[in-house]
């Protein structure tokens, strides 16, 4: 990578789901003549549109987005792959003379890109199959306690009910005989860019109100129909034990339970809102603990994306004059 690329400031728009990241990133990208690198672990998948609040076709025509609609639902992908691929993509964008704006809320994607990542072992289908059998027989709590005994530091960062990361952590332990914490303490692979994080802050009550309103809007725009298409397409293979991580997502989880007859539609809708609010709370906790971001009070700009983008640009120019 040319040394000059490492000196170009790259604004990173952080924030909880529903906080206004997409609109702010687009406004900032238009001001900077930039392309957007999306750090969202679900928007990268095709077919997951309404449920992931993917930028609209019009928004993507206005500003080029990367890592949107690039993978099939069944393709596995992780934070280390994203960090590596995003670094390559950023270098390619800089080579065209454009600037870059990073935007997203996927905590591990952002951490890997901004702070580097440890080299973790490849997936082992045999070990994963055994662990999923253990999960079915003993339940998530038993597996979480097993991880907690071996790696309490890493276990404390996990939600015990989210089995995807739990299984992966135990898989790493069995494959490498080392814990995730031990591997993370080893050599960190860091992209050599100058990232400048900005966070979008809203009063919690307002954020939760926006999440509830956005969820209602998603259902008006056809979220149930989208989930039904995905359920009809992928449920048969999932019933055979095939794990599709992309569909283990807030919104789709609850609607799949409705389609299986386990919940009423109203119950599913309310759970989507509740689980999205819970996720937003975890995102904010992670961002504040892990990143030294300049937090912008989104309410002070009346939640106006352009005004917020101008404020970010002013701060960016003051600290890093480049445009």
Curated annotation (Swiss-Prot):
Site, as annotated: Interaction with substrate tRNA: 106, 128
Domain of life of the source: Bacteria
SS bonds (residue pairs): none
Residues engaged in binding substrate: 17-22
An annotated GO BP: tRNA modification
Protein residues bound to ATP: 15-22
Entry annotated with the keyword Metal-binding: no
Keywords carried by this UniProt record: ATP-binding, Magnesium, Nucleotide-binding, Transferase, tRNA processing
Cofactors, names only: Mg(2+)
Signal peptide segment: none
InterPro entries: Dimethylallyltransferase, IPT, P-loop_NTPase
The protein's Enzyme Commission number: 2.5.1.75
Reaction it catalyzes: adenosine(37) in tRNA + dimethylallyl diphosphate = N(6)-dimethylallyladenosine(37) in tRNA + diphosphate
Region (Interaction with substrate tRNA): 40-43, 164-168
GO MF term set: ATP binding; tRNA dimethylallyltransferase activity
Function: Catalyzes the transfer of a dimethylallyl group onto the adenine at position 37 in tRNAs that read codons beginning with uridine, leading to the formation of N6-(dimethylallyl)adenosine (i(6)A).
Assembly with partners or alone: Monomer.
Membership in a protein family: Belongs to the IPP transferase family.
PANTHER family per record: TRNA DIMETHYLALLYLTRANSFERASE
Name the UniProt record assigns to this protein: tRNA dimethylallyltransferase
Source organism of this protein record: Chloroherpeton thalassium (strain ATCC 35110 / GB-78)
């Amino acid at each position: 990578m040319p040394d000059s690329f490492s000196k170009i400031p790259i604004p990173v728009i952080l924030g909880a789901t529903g906080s206004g990241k997409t609109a702010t990133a687009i406004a900032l990208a238009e001001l900077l003549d930039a392309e957007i690198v999306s750090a969202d672990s679900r928007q990268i998948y095709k077919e997951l549109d309404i449920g992931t609040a993917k930028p609209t076709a019009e928004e993507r025509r206005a500003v080029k987005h990367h890592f949107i609609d690039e993978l099939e639902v069944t393709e596995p992908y992780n934070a280390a792959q994203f960090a590596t691929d995003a670094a390559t993509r950023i270098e390619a964008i800089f080579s065209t003379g454009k600037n870059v704006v990073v935007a997203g809320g996927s905590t591990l994607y952002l951490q890997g890109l901004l702070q580097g990542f440890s080299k973790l072992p490849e997936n082992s289908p045999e070990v994963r199959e055994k662990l999923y059998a253990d999960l079915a027989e003993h339940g998530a709590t038993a597996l979480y306690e097993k991880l907690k005994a071996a790696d309490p530091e890493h276990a404390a960062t996990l939600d015990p009910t989210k089995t995807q990361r739990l299984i992966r952590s135990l898989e790493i332990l069995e494959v490498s005989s080392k814990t995730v914490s031990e591997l993370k303490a080893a050599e960190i692979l860091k992209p050599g860019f100058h990232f400048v994080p900005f966070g979008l802050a809203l009063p919690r009550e307002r954020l939760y109100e926006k999440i509830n309103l956005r969820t209602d809007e998603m259902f008006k725009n056809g979220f149930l129909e989208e989930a039904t298409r995905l359920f009809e397409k992928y449920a048969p293979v999932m019933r055979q034990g095939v794990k599709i991580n992309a569909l283990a997502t807030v919104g789709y989880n609850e609607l799949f339970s409705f389609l299986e007859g386990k919940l009423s539609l109203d119950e599913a809708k309310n759970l989507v809102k509740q689980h999205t609010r819970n996720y937003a709370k975890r995102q904010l906790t992670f961002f504040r603990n892990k990143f030294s971001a300049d937090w912008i009070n989104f309410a002070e700009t009346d939640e106006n994306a352009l005004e917020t983008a101008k404020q970010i640009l002013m701060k960016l120019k003051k600290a890093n004059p480049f445009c």
